[in-house]
């Protein structure tokens, strides 16, 4: 891949980067070089993720190249000192153990790449696999729900139950999959695969019969890059559970528009009266068992409970005290609850003798009791300590820190809201709690009383959680997304010191997108989805007629986003009753976003299939802003040619948390902190959700589509200013409000024009995922413009000259680097060349047949198909008709030619490894990579040379064997030269 100098760092990029991509990568590297934090916005479709990965990986390798070689091997690869091998450092003083652990963590600089969902992380890891940095050791952290392969435990539907059963099985050493983890991590299937995503972990776990969940945790220590969801990083409990050290770590938060909310949620907690009652019941049950058993209780386990009867009696008194304190709180149930300052929670819990001085002891007793309760099985009912676990979770958040500064922060940034607890829905055949805990034979003994309450401990300052990351010794924190603007309030809310910021424009031309505000439907009824108007039958009918009128002129897929599920359901019902639904369905089949995970996957597959079907006229997908469809899904090209935003998805105005958030911002806003007002925040919440939904459509530089804002409130200048800058610029050009007929005419002309526009084909549409992009094959290295461009410094530096690829074990390489041309076969014949890439042109409609339907529009615009033909396997011959054609030939290595014409392997390591891949079979190439990995790790030269001779055992491959000298360690070079001399002597004597 071509290389570019950016801020003094050589960056490998799959193609010549656009100016905005260069600017983006320069900002990323600036943050990393200067140990500062950055907030970077780049619209969806501008190659943000690719730019982020390439620049950060290049910087990481640059830093590693500056370290001494013994540091690069890391402490992890060295034998453990004898004093550390005894019972997990039992002989060491706790401070010494902590210091050694910290030293081990600091020995290796890491990058943590976090995003909202595993789907988004998988997309990022796939991007990484398609770059030159696919050899950088990367691992993903996931949940048991995704990674467990135990035949019984994995069948549990609830993740909480799955966690309990897993821990129980691991603790008893009953899980054979867990028991194989230690040996599996050194197997070639794991050790030689640098980038492992969820799918890779599950596949290798099944193959080796080793637990993917615990295997991923083992691989974290060796990894250079760790991918994980936000909550794994932002939640202190999750960080502790996964053993994450943030010292000297670079944190990249992609899709960071969700970070504010996630930080607030991680710092918040709730406790129900029913949770307290369950905790009391569980404690009482164990006390009774201990009294019946003479003061000891073991449940069904072999290990005796490490708590005395006095401990449990004191715990029960504390729990009863909490229950009484909560019951005594006066609230007006008719008003929905009462609110108190954050420090009220400390006063409330102190009534039950829970305070900073004894909180650690209380939590220790509760955790010990939970561990034993989970193993007790009596009468078909599995006690899982749900109430006690809820208590522990709540107390850990409330007492997350201590000292006067913490109390002051809680007073300012937190609120305690107490509201009535609603009765839970009971499942048929038993009692099912909302958190998934299920009783099978007996009813729950903690019914919700009329005075039951919910204690909400809410954090309203996302900077509270962000500061924990900063204070953990991180090197840099980079927040990036396609929808962060306006940046000032975003930065102010996070209380993050930011030295670098960027707002990138969009990569597409202005002619590729049509943006309009539609204030009235075809029947001239105003389109306004405000709370007062959304139940208006005239409005709902007009919205349906708007969609019906636009369907015939929109090719492919149409996305319709609603502000909420109730409005989506209301429109669906009304349109079906009035017949509008049926009229739309005759033009485009309608799909509705489902709530269930399995249903969602199936529905999406059906939608994509309908859009691809040449016989159809496309499809409609009705979804909700902030739903699954609006976050992270790709509706590129025909899958999303237009998006209708039917309203502004404001948060519920009367929701207690929303009201308190607005109050918090208004109260704490000063000139110095630049916080926004409560009303501005409320408006921004809606605009950011709209920006995310719009971003589903324009997904790359050659995409095009229409963005239709179907709500009169979008005509408001203030509302438009909160949209992404590239959308806002289109709206500024046409301030006049067109009538509906004008919009239909303009949009019809727009799609007609785009259907004839010759946009270049996307790389991913014409090449396999693991192939080199077609453009990169057009010119020989060093001769074309693509290889002669640098961002800064003016020079081209070969990637392999800076870094030894062999040390990072490349898993797979790209297609033959000697590919010369993408001309059609006919052109190539005229030129007398033998190009490797043959283009077959599709026939165009000559106008004699019927015009294609809008749904089939995309099928007629498919890119020219590329067929890759390996050059050594074709020859040109004249047929009987006198036509010169390419014919396949069986190629035998010419020994004489090999002897007379001495081939020289490429000096460039990347080119050399590519030539090795092209010259060997798939099996031999895999053996070659594995042997190289083992040699770099174990220095076993005898085994290595034996495997090399096996791979390069043909005379025409001898030059590659000679070139392997560059990978031989210094202490083995003399031995290697001797063996080569013997091989050459035998070879030429046979001649």
UniProtKB/Swiss-Prot annotation:
PROSITE patterns: HELICASE_ATP_BIND_2. [4Fe-4S] cluster binds at residues 148, 166, 175, 211. One of its GO terms (biological process) is telomeric loop disassembly. Its EC number is 5.6.2.-. It catalyses: ATP + H2O = ADP + phosphate + H(+). GO terms for molecular function: 4 iron, 4 sulfur cluster binding; ATP binding; ATP hydrolysis activity; DNA binding; DNA helicase activity; DNA polymerase binding; metal ion binding. ATP binds at residues 42-49. It is an enzyme of class 5 (isomerase). SUPFAM superfamilies: P-loop containing nucleoside triphosphate hydrolases (SSF52540). It is found in: Nucleus. GO terms for cellular component: nucleus. A motif (DEAH box) lies at residues 254-257. Keywords: 4Fe-4S, ATP-binding, DNA damage, DNA repair, DNA-binding, Helicase, Hydrolase, Iron, Iron-sulfur, Isomerase, Metal-binding, Nucleotide-binding, Nucleus. Residues 7-319 form the Helicase ATP-binding domain. Residues 812-833 are annotated as: Disordered. InterPro entries: ATP-dep_Helicase_C, DinG/Rad3-like, Helic_SF1/SF2_ATP-bd_DinG/Rad3, Helicase-like_DEXD_c2, HHD_RTEL1, P-loop_NTPase, RAD3-like_helicase_DEAD, Rad3/Chl1-like. Transmembrane segments: none annotated. A probable ATP-dependent DNA helicase implicated in DNA repair and the maintenance of genomic stability. Acts as an anti-recombinase to counteract toxic recombination and limit crossover during meiosis. Regulates meiotic recombination and crossover homeostasis by physically dissociating strand invasion events and thereby promotes noncrossover repair by meiotic synthesis dependent strand annealing (SDSA) as well as disassembly of D loop recombination intermediates. Belongs to the helicase family. RAD3/XPD subfamily. PANTHER family: DNA REPAIR DEAD HELICASE RAD3/XP-D SUBFAMILY MEMBER, REGULATOR OF TELOMERE ELONGATION HELICASE 1. HAMAP family: RTEL1 (MF_03065). This is Regulator of telomere elongation helicase 1 homolog. It comes from Anopheles gambiae (African malaria mosquito).
């Amino acid at each position: 891949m071509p290389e570019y100098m950016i801020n003094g760092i050589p960056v490998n990029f799959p193609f010549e980067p656009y100016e905005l991509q260069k600017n983006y990568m320069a900002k990323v590297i600036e943050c990393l070089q200067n140990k500062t934090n950055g907030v970077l916005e780049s619209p969806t479709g501008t190659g943000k993720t690719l730019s982020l990965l390439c620049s950060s990986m290049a910087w990481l390798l640059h830093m590693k190249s500056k370290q001494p070689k013994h540091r690069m091997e890391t402490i992890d690869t060295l034998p453990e000192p004898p004093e550390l091998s005894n019972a997990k450092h039992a002989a060491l003083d706790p401070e010494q153990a902590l210091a050694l652990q910290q030293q081990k963590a600091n020995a290796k600089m890491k990058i943590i790449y976090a995003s909202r969902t595993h789907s988004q992380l998988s997309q990022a890891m796939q991007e990484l696999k398609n770059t030159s940095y696919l050899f950088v050791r990367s691992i993903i952290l996931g949940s048991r729900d995704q990674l467990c392969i135990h035949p019984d435990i994995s069948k549990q539907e609830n993740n909480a139950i799955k966690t309990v059963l897993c821990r129980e099985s691991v603790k008893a050493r009953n899980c054979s999959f867990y028991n194989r983890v230690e040996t599996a991590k050194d197997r070639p299937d794991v050790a030689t695969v640098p980038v492992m995503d969820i799918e890779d972990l599950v596949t290798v776990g099944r193959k080796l019969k080793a637990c993917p969940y615990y295997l991923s945790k083992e691989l974290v220590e060796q990894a250079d890059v760790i991918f994980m969801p936000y909550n794994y990083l932002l939640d202190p409990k999750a960080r502790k559970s996964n053993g994450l050290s943030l010292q000297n770590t670079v944190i990249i938060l992609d899709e960071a528009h969700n970070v504010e909310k996630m930080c607030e949620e991680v710092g918040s907690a709730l406790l129900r009266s029913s949770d307290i009652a369950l905790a009391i019941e569980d404690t009482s049950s164990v006390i009774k068992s201990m009294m019946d058993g003479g003061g000891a209780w073991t449940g069904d386990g072999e290990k005796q409970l490490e708590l005395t009867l006095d401990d449990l009696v004191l715990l029960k008194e504390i729990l009863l005290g909490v229950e009484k304190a909560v019951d005594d709180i006066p609230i007006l149930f008719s008003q929905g609850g009462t609110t108190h300052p954050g420090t009220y929670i400390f006063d409330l819990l102190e009534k039950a003798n829970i305070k900073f001085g004894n909180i650690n002891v209380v939590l220790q007793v509760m955790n010990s009791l939970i561990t034993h309760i989970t193993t007790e099985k009596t009468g078909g009912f599995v006690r899982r300590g749900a109430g006690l676990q809820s208590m522990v979770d709540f107390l850990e958040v409330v007492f997350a820190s201590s000292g006067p500064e913490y109390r002051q922060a809680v007073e300012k940034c937190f609120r305690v809201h107490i509201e009535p607890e609603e009765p839970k829905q009971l499942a048929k055949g038993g009692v099912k709690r909302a958190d998934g805990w299920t009783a099978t034979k007996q009813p729950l003994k903690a019914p919700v009383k009329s005075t039951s309450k919910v204690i909400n401990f809410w954090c309203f300052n996302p900077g509270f959680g962000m500061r924990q990351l900063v204070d953990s010794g991180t090197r840099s924190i980079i927040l990036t997304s396609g929808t962060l603007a306006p940046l000032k309030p975003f930065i102010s809310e996070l209380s993050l010191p930011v030295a670098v910021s960027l707002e990138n424009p969009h990569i597409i031309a202005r002619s590729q997108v049509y943006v309009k505000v539609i204030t009235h439907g075809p029947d001239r009824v105003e389109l306004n989805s405000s709370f007062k108007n959304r139940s208006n039958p005239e409005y709902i009918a007009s919205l349906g007629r708007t969609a019906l009128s636009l369907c015939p002129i929109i090719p492919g897929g149409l996305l319709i986003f609603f502000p909420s599920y109730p409005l989506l359901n209301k429109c669906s019902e009304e349109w079906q009753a009035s017949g509008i639904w049926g009229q739309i369905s005759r033009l485009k089949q309608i799909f509705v976003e489902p709530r269930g995970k399995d249903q969602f996957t199936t529905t999406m597959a059906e939608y994509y299939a309908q859009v691809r079907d040449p016989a159809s006229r496309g499809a409609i997908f009705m979804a909700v802003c902030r739903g699954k469809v609006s976050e992270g899904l790709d509706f590129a090209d025909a899958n999303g040619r237009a998006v209708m935003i039917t309203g502004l998805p404001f948060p519920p105005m009367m929701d207690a948390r929303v009201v308190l958030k607005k109050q918090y911002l208004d109260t704490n806003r000063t000139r110095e902190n630049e916080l926004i007002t409560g009303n501005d925040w409320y408006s921004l919440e809606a605009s950011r959700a709209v920006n995310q939904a719009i971003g589903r459509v324009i997904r790359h530089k050659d995409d095009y589509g229409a963005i239709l804002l179907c709500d009169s409130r979008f005509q408001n200048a203030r509302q438009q200013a909160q949209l992404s800058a590239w959308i806002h610029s289109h709206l500024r050009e046409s301030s006049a409000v067109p009538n509906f007929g004008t919009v239909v005419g303009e949009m019809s002309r727009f799609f007609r024009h785009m259907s004839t526009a010759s946009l270049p084909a996307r790389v991913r549409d014409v090449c396999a995922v693991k192939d080199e992009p077609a453009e990169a094959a057009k010119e020989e290295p060093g001769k074309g413009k693509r290889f002669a461009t640098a961002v800064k410094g003016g020079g081209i530096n070969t990637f392999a000259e800076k870094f030894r690829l062999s040390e990072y074990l490349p898993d797979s390489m790209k297609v033959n680097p000697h590919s010369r041309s993408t001309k059609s076969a006919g052109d190539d014949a005229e030129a007398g060349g033998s190009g490797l890439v043959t283009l077959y042109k599709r026939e165009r409609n000559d106008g004699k047949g019927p015009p294609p339907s809008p749904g089939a529009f995309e099928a007629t615009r498919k890119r020219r198909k590329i067929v890759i033909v390996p050059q050594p396997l074709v020859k040109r011959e004249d047929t009987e008709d006198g036509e010169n054609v390419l014919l396949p030939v069986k190629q035998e290595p010419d020994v004489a030619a090999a002897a007379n014409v001495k081939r020289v392997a490429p000096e460039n390591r990347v080119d050399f490894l590519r030539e090795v891949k092209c010259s060997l079979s798939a099996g031999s190439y895999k053996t070659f990579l594995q042997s190289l990995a083992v040699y770099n790790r174990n220095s076993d030269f005898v085994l290595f040379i034996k495997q090399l001779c096996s791979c390069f055992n043909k005379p025409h491959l001898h030059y590659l064997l000679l070139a392997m000298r560059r990978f031989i360690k210094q202490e083995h070079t003399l031995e290697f030269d001797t063996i080569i001399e013997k091989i050459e002597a035998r070879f030429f004597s046979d001649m």
